[in-house]
From Swiss-Prot:
Superkingdom, taxonomy of origin: Viruses
Role noted for this protein: Intermediate capsid protein that self assembles to form an icosahedral capsid with a T=13 symmetry, which consists of 230 trimers of VP6, with channels at each of its five-fold vertices. This capsid constitutes the middle concentric layer of the viral mature particle. The innermost VP2 capsid and the intermediate VP6 capsid remain intact following cell entry to protect the dsRNA from degradation and to prevent unfavorable antiviral responses in the host cell during all the replication cycle of the virus.
Region feature Interaction with the inner capsid protein VP2, mapped onto this chain: 62-73
Native source organism of the sequence: Rotavirus A (strain RVA/Pig/Mexico/YM/1983/G11P9[7])
Record-level GO cellular component terms: viral envelope; viral intermediate capsid
Protein name: Intermediate capsid protein VP6
One GO process term, biological-process aspect: fusion of virus membrane with host plasma membrane
Pfam families noted in UniProt: Rota_Capsid_VP6
Binding site for Zn(2+): 153
Keywords: Calcium, Capsid protein, Intermediate capsid protein, Metal-binding, Ubl conjugation, Virion, Zinc
Gene3D superfamilies for this protein: 2.60.120.170, Viral capsid alpha domain
Family classification: Belongs to the rotavirus VP6 family.
Amino acid sequence: MEVLYSLSKTLKDARDKIVEGTLYSNVSDLIQQFNQMIVTMNGNDFQTGGIGNLPIRNWTFDFGLLGTTLLNLDANYVENARTTIEYFIDFIDNVCMDEIARESQRNGIAPQSEALRKLSGIKFKRINFDNSSDYIENWNLQNRRHGTGFVFHKPNILPYSASFTLNRSQPAHDNLMGTMWINAGSEIQVAGFDYSCAFNAPANIQQFEHVVPLRRALTTATITLLPDAERFSFPRVINSADGTTTWYFNPVILRPSNVEVEFLLNGQIINTYQARFGTIIARNFDTIRLSFQLVRPPNMTPAVANLFPQAPPFIFHATVGLTLRIESAVCESVLADASETLLANVTSVRQEYAIPVGPVFPPGMNWTELITNYSPSREDNLQRVFTVASIRSMLIK
C-alpha cells in the first residue's frame, strides 16, 4: 500500500510540475525520484482485472529515463515524459479498481489483487518517497492491529432509522401520545407529541426519552443540539404499527422543557448536559440518551387555548422536539464521511463494472446495512478499499 501511494504521489507531482518552460533545476529532485520509480518498475509484468466486467489487462514496464538539461524543459522533453506518466497513471488506476473490486472474509486489510500483492514485495520497497497520508498511516496501524484514529468532519455512524412509538393509543387513533424519530448519518431528530397537550398527565407534563446506541465509540466530538425537530414540524399521514390503517399527525410546536442529553460509554455516563443548546462537547461515548418534556402551558391566550382543548376532538397536536448533529469526532473505525467521496468512489467502481456480491459487503454497498452489521471483517475490508480509493483520487477525479 505504501508503494501504491508513493507511485501515485510521484505521478501526481510529475503530471503537475513537468511542463513545458519549467526550469530543470526546479524539478530536478522530482525527476530523480521519477527515474528511481522507472528503474524499479522496469522489467516487471503485472495483470489486473478479471472480476465482474473489469477487463483483464497486462502491463509491461520498459521505459527510458528522463535526462538532464541545463535550461528549461522543452516540448520534446515534456512529451517524452507525458507518455511514461500517462501509462503509469493508467496502471495505477487499474490496480486501484482491481483492489476495490475484491473482498475477503479473512485478513481483509491485506492486499487482495494480484498486482497489489506483487507491488508489496521487497523489490519495490525502494519506491517509498512520501507516506504522509492519514489513510496510509491508519492502514498501517490497522494492519498491525494497533488503535487507529480517524478524524471525521461528519461521521456517518448512524444507520437510517425512522419510526415511532405510541405510549397511548386507541383503535380510532384520535388521542395519541408518543415519540417519533429519524436517525441517519450523523444526525438525530426526535419529537414527542401528545394530542391532548398533556391535559391528563401528572402535573400536565409528559416525559419523553430517545436512546441511540452507536455501532462504534466516538471521542472528542463536537455536537450541535437544537430545541427543535424540523422534520416533524408539518402535517403528515402515518401508517399504523400493524399496517391496517393510517393516522393523522398535525403538529403545533412547543419548546421542549427540562432537556437533558447524556453520553454513555459501556453503560457509564461520561458527559451530561441539561438545558444547554448550541455547541456541546462529548468526550467519549457509544450511546446517546435524550430526554425532554412537553409541558402544557399554564397560561394561554384564547387563540392558543383553542389549539389545545380539554376534550376531543383534538385537531392540533402538541409537539416538542430535539435535533442532535455530530459535527466532528474521532473514531477508531473507518467510516463513511459526509465531507469525503471515498464511499461514493468505491460504490461507483463496483457498480460500473458489475462486481458480483461477495462474502463481506452488502449488495450495492448499502451503507445502512453495512454499518448496522459492522463486523471486524467489514471494517478490515472497508479500511483497505477506502485507503485505495484515497490513493486513486489523487490521480483520477
